Amino acid sequence: MSRIGNKVIVIPAGVSVEVNGATVTVKGPKGELVRSFNENITLEIAENEITVKRPNDTKEMKMLHGTTRALLANMVEGVSNGFSKALEMIGVGYRAQLQGTKLVLSVGKSHQDEVEAPENIKFVVATPTSIVVEGISKEAVGQTAAYIRSRRSPEPYKGKGIRYVGEYVRRKEGKTGK
């Protein structure tokens, strides 16, 4: 049984949280995030802490309680520190380059894949085979990184493709001849 919803969220210095009905606005040094939550979940802000409360102990409310607390904690973390996801490209001729806010991928296709950076997302290409997706929304960073990975996900025979840094790709044995 998870008790993540009962944990208090500490608001760091330089971050402000406003609650307007079911809409929460979190402002910080890196930017601003706005999100709507369920009306039944109440948020109490005291000094530099946010407490998430639920009206009753039904299964649905317990689920919403933990989810709301986790999303709110990620919003506070995002506007203060930000999130990043690193990817690496493995394969001959596989490379990435930036053209303005666009990421251009050469991954063994007859054409180049272009990925436009969504709002509040930034691409960093340190080397031609490494990509870092940075932003203030954990959800948007993860989705953008997953989209880039889907352009050429790692294949199990040679391990070529785009993968997260530290991701383990399960390898298969090739066909054996007669």
Swiss-Prot record:
One of its GO terms (molecular function) is rRNA binding. GO terms for cellular component: cytosolic large ribosomal subunit. Keywords: Ribonucleoprotein, Ribosomal protein, RNA-binding, rRNA-binding. SUPFAM superfamilies: Ribosomal protein L6 (SSF56053). PROSITE patterns: RIBOSOMAL_L6_1. GO terms for biological process: cytoplasmic translation. Transmembrane segments: none annotated. Part of the 50S ribosomal subunit. This protein binds to the 23S rRNA, and is important in its secondary structure. It is located near the subunit interface in the base of the L7/L12 stalk, and near the tRNA binding site of the peptidyltransferase center. Belongs to the universal ribosomal protein uL6 family. This is Large ribosomal subunit protein uL6. It comes from Lactococcus lactis subsp. cremoris (strain MG1363). The lineage of its organism: Bacteria, Bacillati, Bacillota, Bacilli, Lactobacillales. The gene is rplF.
